[in-house]
Structures are given as C-alpha cells and as structure tokens.
Amino acid sequence: MSLLTTSEAAARLGVKNETLYAYVSRGLIGRVRSDDGRSSRFESDEVDAIVRTRRGGPVAGDQPGSPIAGMVIATDVTTLHPDGVRFRGRNAAVCARTMTFESTAEWLWSGLEPGPSVTWASDPTVVAAAVRASRLLPSGALLPDHLRVMTAVIAAHDPMRFDPRPEAFMAATRSLLAALVDALPLRRPGAPPKLRLGEQAITGSLAARLWIRLSPLRPDPGALGAMNGAMVMLADHELATSTFGVRVAASTRADPYACISAGLGVLAGPLHGSASAAVHHLLVAASQPEGPTAAVAAMLRRGDRIPGFGHPLYPDGDPRAVALLDLLRASASNRRRMAIVDGIEAAVGRRKPAAPNVDFALAALGFVAMMPPDAGETIFAIARSAGWIAHALEEMSEAPLRYRIRAQPRP
C-alpha cells in the first residue's frame, strides 16, 4: 500500500490541504493516522480513484442516486474538520465568541477585516415598502414567508442590483440583510441593546436588532452574545444544499437578491432550515407537567424520529451545537427552560447515545428566549445569507453556466 502525505495527496488532487480535509469530513476519502498521531497519510490508489471519477463516475460518499455524483467544487470559503468549522482558516467557534456576525460576514466575503466606513444600515424608504408588502400576507404566514416576499420587494427598489462587481454585491447584501431585519415587527419595543464581546460594547448590531423582533425578553449580555454566536456559527457550512442552489444561481450571473432568493427557496424545505421548528415543538411538549422523558417517549410511541440529534458529517457530535449550547448555558437567565433543554438531551442520551446537532441548539436558543417556533429558521436564513453571498462571489470568478447536467431516460 502506497501512502501519500497530506501535501502530496492535495497536490495530486489539485486542491488545497484544507479542501482535502473537507473531503475527509464528508466521507469522500479515508485517511491513515501516522505513528505520531498528529499527521495523516492517504492511500494513493484512493486518491487516484477520485482523480478519475472527477472526469466522470461516482465518488464514494455521494448520496445514492445523486445526479451530481462525482462533482467536487473547490472553495476557499469554509472547510469542515472533525473538530469544527473553519471560515477561511478561522475556527468558527472562536469567531462566535470574539466577532460580530457582521465582521464574520465581511471575513467570509473577502478575507479582510471591515474598515470603519463599512455600515450595515437600512434605507427607511425601502424598509417601509417591505413592511407594506409584508402586511399583505395572511395572518398565519411564517416569518420566513415574510423574508421571501420582502427580499423581492427590496430587490425591486435597487435599480443597480445588476452591478456584478464584488464591492457592489457586498454593499447590496449589507443593505438587504439590514432591511430584512428592520422590517420585521417588534416584539420588544425600544432601542436594541448593546452587544458585548470582551471589552467591546457594540451599538446597533444585527444580532440585537433581530433579538427585539423575535423575543419579548430583555436579554442579558450573555444571551445576546449567544444570539450573535448562533448567527456566526450558522453563517456558512461548506456546500449545504441551499448553498449549492445559490452557486447555481450565481453561475447564471444572477444579482445578489436573486442569489439569496434561491437560497431561501431551498432553505424552506423541512429537512434543511426549518428543522429547528420540530425541535422547538418537542421542547414545548417537554415543558408540560409530564416532563422531557414523557415528551420523548410520546414521539417514540408514535414512531416519530427524535429531531435535533445526530449529523452525518459529525459522527462524534456536531461541534457547532457544542459551541452554541456552551454559550447558552453560560448565559441562560431562564434557568427553568434551560433545564428542559438539558432534560431532553439527557432523555435521548439514555435511550441511545446521540449528540445534539446545531438544529437542536438553535431551537434551544429560541425556546429559552421565548421566541416563536419559526424563529430558528429566521435566524438561520439571515445568518446563512452571509455564506451564500461568499459562495456567490466565489462562483462569479468561475466560468458561467458550468452546472449543465446531462439528462437521460429514467430506468
């Protein structure tokens, strides 16, 4: 058996070391630990097989029956590792404790720290138009429904949206996300609280502006930090399904609003962005007098899958959930509700050891802060828009219309 070093394997594949590690985390390639326990080796035959399949044929680890089997998209935006997610080389869990969501977005887009002139402000005229359109929706419409409608309205108010320059893409996204948040109805009147990160006290953060539109509670510094941390952790996750949809849109040279609309459409599926709503309903059931164990038992009796546990890319546990739950436990002022969250985790763990995933952690944040069930998808949509645009910008540097998949008769 011929073994290659990490650098040798990456060179043969024509990718960076970080991308090779992402292949490992996605199960596309195996690795052999070196004797020192710190470095890895890769079987040359397996590396060569991937090189061949990139010219056509399936890659191990693809979904069975996938029409895009064998497709690997090189990216510098985000890589997945067993110990966590990295945004352009930065550990996302560290970013969640030390950076605002806005700074994280700027880093994902350009790999640079934002300058003092960069603002995330909304246009009051555009916000008013978005609010008017939003009010036309039926009373039972979900918050993500409002986001999709308002995105189209905000786009129509930007005659320069077809400017393909990266700086124009980024400017449009800043104003869009700010307007989407500011157009949501307030659940807690008053000015947004200050976000505290270390010694910094930040006024007008997107996390604070979103908090007062989702929660009726006044957050303590730790709770608002958990909200910002959730947005940071969710900002990107490599080539999730919605991100692939955005890259396809960008390959047609769609404008930033259309790219985000593409992502929002894919995110609407119950297996993606709205997965946290099912966890929220479980937590509500667990808050009844019978308690968490009874709520889990009732789901099992109905033959339902317990939502919010396990992740195919993280067999040893989702590091995003660990980071977010740590932030939440350190801050939770609503101890009774946090105890219910812990009770669900313990009840599931007694039946079969399973680690919570980021959907569970996101639902826990919303439940503890007394947000509505669709708050998780709303936070997810706003946060993931940052990563979508990072991938759209990267895709704009590639050949256009490169995702032309051939059709064949069904067997």
Task: Give short role names for the model-derived ranges.
Residues S2-E8, R12-P411:
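Hydrophobic alpha-helical bundle cores within soluble ligand-binding/oligomerization subdomains
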